[in-house]
Every structure is written in structure tokens, then in C-alpha cells.
């Protein structure tokens, strides 16, 4: 788990949420550097959450951000299970409906930005509503 120095100079452990938030900020900056535009972060819809919503041209990009210290158990990308994909699809469907859209009317895709150790992997169109 990442650490941050306290005022006294001794490190304290970050919570899982703080660590996740920090990697989401890193992913946002990295994607913006690749030309995507930020729309929203930590979008909650009926119990599901989407880490980032970005735009690439006319495409709405729903982004799941994952971090693992090592690839020992498959790395960060491998942690996006079918169950997690289903929850992301449902959350995106609800978000689109709230914004007067649907998978039929809005060009969108689901990407994963996976940080494993110091490596970053951007998996465009990692899964879709037909998976």
C-alpha cells in the first residue's frame, strides 16, 4: 500500500480509498495527456460506481481504474471480473439514461487503465454491452 509522510516525517498508511483516489487522479491526468477530456469522476448510480467518465472526440469513455503492486496474481487488468463488468455496464446504462441517452444513441466504450507496479496499461474497449 502507498504511504505518505506525516508532518512529523514518519510515514502513515493510506486507506484503500485514498490509494484508489490517488490512482484515479493519475489515470485522469494520463488520459488527458493522451487527448481525452474529463467529464466526471466517481459517478454513483444505484450502488454502482464508475471511476472516470471521459470524452475522446464524440465517444463517451467509461473508465475503470485498477492498481496492483505486482502482477503476482494476474495484475491490475485481470482484476476486472465479469461481475465487475456487469456492474459497470448497469451503472453506465443508468448514467446515460439520466443524461437522455442509451447504448443505442450514444457512441461509448469501456476502457481499463491498469497500473501494475510502475507500469501503466490502457485497454481500450476492454468490454462492451455485448460481452
From Swiss-Prot:
Residues 1-20 are annotated as: Disordered. GO terms for molecular function: nucleic acid binding. InterPro entries: Restrct_endonuc-II-like, tRNA_endonuc-like_dom_sf, UPF0102_YraN-like. Residues 1-19 have a biased composition (Polar residues). Belongs to the UPF0102 family. HAMAP family: UPF0102. This is UPF0102 protein YraN. It comes from Escherichia fergusonii (strain ATCC 35469 / DSM 13698 / CCUG 18766 / IAM 14443 / JCM 21226 / LMG 7866 / NBRC 102419 / NCTC 12128 / CDC 0568-73). The gene is yraN.
Amino acid at each position: 500500500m502507498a504511504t505518505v509522510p506525516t508532518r512529523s516525517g514518519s510515514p502513515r498508511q493510506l486507506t484503500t480509498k485514498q490509494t484508489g483516489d490517488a490512482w484515479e487522479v493519475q489515470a485522469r491526468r494520463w488520459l488527458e495527456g493522451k487527448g481525452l477530456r474529463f467529464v466526471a469522476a466517481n459517478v454513483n448510480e444505484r450502488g454502482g460506481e464508475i471511476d472516470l467518465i471521459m470524452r475522446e472526440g464524440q465517444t463517451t469513455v467509461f473508465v475503470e481504474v485498477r492498481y496492483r503492486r505486482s502482477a503476482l496474481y494476474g495484475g491490475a487488468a485481470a482484476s476486472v471480473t465479469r461481475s465487475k463488468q456487469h456492474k459497470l455496464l448497469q451503472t453506465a446504462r443508468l448514467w446515460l439514461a439520466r443524461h437522455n441517452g442509451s447504448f443505442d444513441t450514444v457512441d461509448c466504450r469501456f476502457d481499463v487503465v491498469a497500473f501494475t507496479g510502475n507500469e501503466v496499461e490502457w485497454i481500450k474497449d476492454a468490454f462492451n454491452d455485448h460481452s
